[in-house]
Amino acid sequence: MKKRLSWLSFLLLLAAFTNIQCAKHALPPTAVSMPVIQGAVCVGCDRCADCHEEACNAFAKTIHGRIAPFETAGLGTGCETCHGGGSLHVESEDPGDIITFAKLTAAQQSRICLDCHTRFHWAGSEHYLNDVSCLQCHKIHPPVGNKLLAKSEPDGCYSCHMDIQAKAQYPSHHPIREGKMGCSDCHDPHGSMVGSLLKTDERLNDLCLNCHASKQGPFVFEHAPVLEDCTICHAPHGTIANNLLKQNEPFICLQCHEFHFHSAKVGYDQSTDGDSPSTYYVPGAYPEAHNLSQRSSFKRAWTTKCTQCHFKIHGSDLPSQAVPGQGKALTR
C-alpha cells in the first residue's frame, strides 16, 4: 500500500511539474484571441479596389491572388480572407472597422496565416516562442520572389541571425555564400519536431548523413561520436579549423583521447624513445626525448595531426595494422 502511495505521489508531482513547464510557453496559434469586427460582412475585392487599386492589382499577381475558392476549404479568397468582412470599412473608411495587420501581435498575424497553412509545426517552434510572425519573412501584397520572401536566402535569415552570418565567413564553411545551398536545406523556419528548427524528426546525424552518406556506415570499427552526434566534433555554420572542426588537430582529439606512442610522447614521457611502431622500442632513436626543455620534441608533438594515421576517423571495416591489439584505431 505504501509503495502504491509513493508511486502515486511521484506521478502527481510529475504532472504538476509538466503543467508548470507548459504554462511558461505561449498559447498555441489556435488558442490566440483574435479581434472581431462586429456587424461586418464581406463585400468582395472589387469594392476594396475602389480605394486600394494599386495594392489590389499587385495582389492579383501573387499566388494568393490566383487561389481558386475550392482550395481554401470555405475560408474564401481575396482581401477579406485575411482582413475580415469589409462592409463597415467601406461605409466609414475608418481603419478601425477592419482588421489591420499593423495593429496585431505577432501571434495574431501568424494565426490568420495558419488558417490556411496548416501543415506546419509552428506552435512551440523557436520562431513562434520568440514572437516572430510570418510577415517578418514574407510579403503578402507585392508579387515578390520565391515563396513571397521579403529577402532571399540567406539574407533574410541573416537579418536576425547575425552571429551565424559571421560564422559563414570563416575559412571552413558550408557553401552558402557560394550559392550552392541555403539555410532551408537544414532548417525548417516554420517549425520542426526537434530543436533548432532542424529538418529531421529523429537523430541530428540523420540530417547530416543526407549529404554525407559515405560517413554513415555501419562499420565494423565505429567511432562513437559519429553514432551519437556530429556536432561533438563539427560546428556546421563555420569554423577556422578545416572540415568544420571545432578545434584544430590534435587538440580536438585530445578532448577525449590522451596522446600515445606518436611524437607527442617524445617530449612528454621519458620511457618513450620513439614516435612510431618501428622506433617505439629503439633506444636512442630520439636522444632529445629525455630533455623536456627541447623545443623540437614538442614541435613534433603539436604539429602532428591524428588523421595522418587515423584517417578513417568516421569508421572502418578493416582492422588496423602495426598496432598490436588495437583493431579499432581507424587507420585504414
Please provide the spans of the model-predicted regions.
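Bacterial N-terminal signal peptides that target proteins for export
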Residues: 1-10
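Bacterial N-terminal signal peptides
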Residues: 9-19
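Short sequence/structural segments immediately N-terminal
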Residues: 4-5, 19-332
